[in-house]
A protein has these predicted regions:
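N-terminal Rossmann-like or analogous alpha/beta NTP/dinucleotide-binding catalytic cores
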Residues: 1-51, 61, 153
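Alpha-helical recognition segments enriched in aromatics with Gly/Pro capping
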Residues: 46-49, 60-182
Length: 182
C-alpha cells in the first residue's frame, strides 16, 4: 500500500461514519481494465487534430517535426514500469504503435489489448466528462485561466470526442496563513 492509498482509505472510512455514501471511481483501474481503450485509440487516430488544438494556445510556434512526433498518450513500460517511453510510430488505424523506453526496452504496443497507458491530462479530462456524464465541473484558477485546461479541454471534448463540455466554475485557491502553495 502506498502513502497516498493509506490516506485515501482513512478518508473513505471517515465518510461512512457520517453516513455519506460515495461511488469511488479509480481512473487507474478504469484504464487498466480496458474501459478507455477505444477512446485512447480514437485519440491516437486524431493525434494531429489534438496537436493543432493544443498548439493554438501555445506561445511559441510548433515545428512540423513536433506535430508529427506528438502522441496524446503515455505508455507504461512493461519492463521498468515507468512512463518514460517515446512512441516512434503508429499504425494508420491507431491501434498499434512502436515505442522505446529510457530503460532501453523497445516494443510494439496494442492499445486494444495493452491497457497500462494514460491519455495526457487535457485529453483525459474531456474523455472522462463524456464517459461519466459530467454536467458541472469546478476547478482552480489554473484550470480556469484563459487558454488553461478547461478552454483547451472543452474544444477537445467537442471536436475529438463529439461531447459537450460541462458547465465550469473556476475558484481561487484557499491558503492558510503562513504556508505556501495550493
Amino acid at each position: 500500500s502506498s502513502y497516498a492509498e493509506h490516506f485515501e482509505k482513512e478518508f473513505e472510512a471517515s465518510l461512512s461514519r457520517f453516513g455519506v455514501k460515495v461511488d469511488f471511481r479509480r481512473q487507474s483501474e478504469n484504464y487498466r481494465s480496458g474501459k478507455y481503450a477505444k477512446y485512447v485509440i480514437q485519440a491516437v487516430q486524431k493525434r494531429r487534430e489534438i496537436f493543432d488544438i493544443l498548439d493554438k494556445f501555445r506561445q511559441q510556434v510548433a515545428t512540423p517535426e513536433e506535430r508529427e512526433a506528438y502522441y496524446p498518450v503515455s505508455i507504461y513500460c512493461p519492463v521498468c514500469g515507468k512512463d518514460e517511453t517515446t512512441i516512434t510510430s503508429s499504425s494508420e488505424d491507431g491501434v498499434t504503435c512502436e515505442y522505446t523506453c529510457k530503460c532501453g526496452h523497445k516494443g510494439t504496443w496494442d492499445f486494444s489489448k495493452d491497457f497500462n497507458c494514460k491519455l495526457a491530462w487535457k485529453i483525459d479530462w474531456p474523455m472522462r466528462w463524456m464517459i461519466e456524464g459530467v454536467d458541472f465541473e469546478p476547478g482552480g484558477k489554473d484550470h480556469a485561466s484563459p487558454g488553461g485546461s478547461y478552454d483547451t479541454s472543452k474544444i477537445i471534448a467537442k471536436k475529438i470526442f463529439g461531447a459537450q463540455a460541462p458547465m465550469f466554475k473556476g475558484y481561487e485557491f484557499v491558503g492558510i496563513k503562513g504556508t505556501t502553495g495550493k
